[in-house]
């Protein structure tokens, strides 16, 4: 049992005592995490009039967002330049989103009364994460490298900031950060994809061809079918034009599979053995008993397909598997390296090679993965641990992260992971700001050879090229209940690397087991335990009325061993009440002799964190209203009741913007 203690206070640099976490910071009704469905949209004559007014507001907000100037002094008081507008009916389906969406289903009533200002809304747009110029975006699709350019396709609604009219947006980059927008790659213009050009994957063939398999939602029945497209000119480095096959659809739902439970084909792989030269493609599904499935098809020409004799894998009770991904991993360096150690998708199974099977679970909107062994003779996959099988074990990310997709980068010989980071604000706020969703920072993926049981994810090494001025804070003592401000200047675009050490005698002196702790059901950073929480507060204002806490929490297990949780607390991230605010996190493996380490990327309304070299990752969408522009701060804190903590090393860099923009027609360089 953890003893009750008084509220923590500390002395800051000026000698004034301040509360670590103020009691007067209501979360709003969304903070409990309940996701409420919207009533069906009902267009009216009034809606048409309101839509016209809304359009004028959106133009103003979009102009402000596009300028993205982060140099204003001080925060913006709530209510100044407030945007007050009725919300037009959603252009999405009745609930306002699709079954492919992970946006919070907030109600249209009392939760939508926050007075957002234009300055607040403009500040939320990210500076170095990928976003389209405007409107709704979801899954990353078909990433690849071609003739000097990285390509990213993505699910996009060109007409609105809500889901609908899904097309394929397209952008290119030399470095995975500085993106140039190209014209649409594919639009819903055939009966087999009239209701949406949904997710898919690219495969590069030995002869240089690039084939793109994608899911289409059909015009008459909204059935999910698989379609083939190829570049009109594969010699074009920008792959600006795509041609859909006359053979489409090339795959339809098989017997026993529901017509809307058959989607998101993987990158094809091939491991030739004897006369078997067929490519394998996996597709996500579920059966009538709600087991999640990965179906496998074999093809020589990507037009004609034969089903494999057995399922690649199935896990009872996990429901529909979306955006299945399947790829090999080799022994890495044991640390989160920026390049190398990746394997091409068709790498042959064998000693030292494992295969990752990942599924995005439609039931809970999280990305789960497992490590196992692939048998190309039977096209089946077996997890190394049944307890850590797909959908019941490890996740890529314990925060807001979904519909991910990897690709192999032949230049730096690495596997790169993309993930969709949806919004957790209201649809009304999305419409006001004119956009919804970002892509995560691309991450390298390696097998963690120190544990052998998990992946390591780390921001691609190119992120370090965005670093500008930096500061170091070494050997900072964090007494129990303390908060220490760090003077880093502008604190809205940051790369933070921190290493913490807990006094060994404090940890050894704890004798009581604490087996009930869980990040998501805890009180967040406000809760006090014997050995935690401690870490950093980012996007915080001076009086800590807004803050996003990234922290460790240590506890003793029943066997006397120390366990380490890594958590991210959004409960006080914003004063706005039209948000879903949660505490995310999970256990993170910490090996003997390792200090506690974390890397944090802060980019306006998104915070991505990587603990212990990327063993556990958490992504949050946060929407500060006070800790914005020059009012954003960074703090160290220790809210433990028993542990003395030292921040051995804290390095913080300001990051430049990526200046994502349309592709210039007169040049092919950045």
UniProtKB/Swiss-Prot annotation:
Subcellular location: Membrane; Vacuole lumen
Transmembrane regions listed in the UniProt entry: 45-65
SMART domains, sorted: Glyco_32 (SM00640)
Catalytic activity: Hydrolysis of terminal non-reducing beta-D-fructofuranoside residues in beta-D-fructofuranosides
GO biological process: sucrose metabolic process
Keyword rRNA-binding recorded: no
Protein name: Beta-fructofuranosidase 1
Originating gene: IVR1
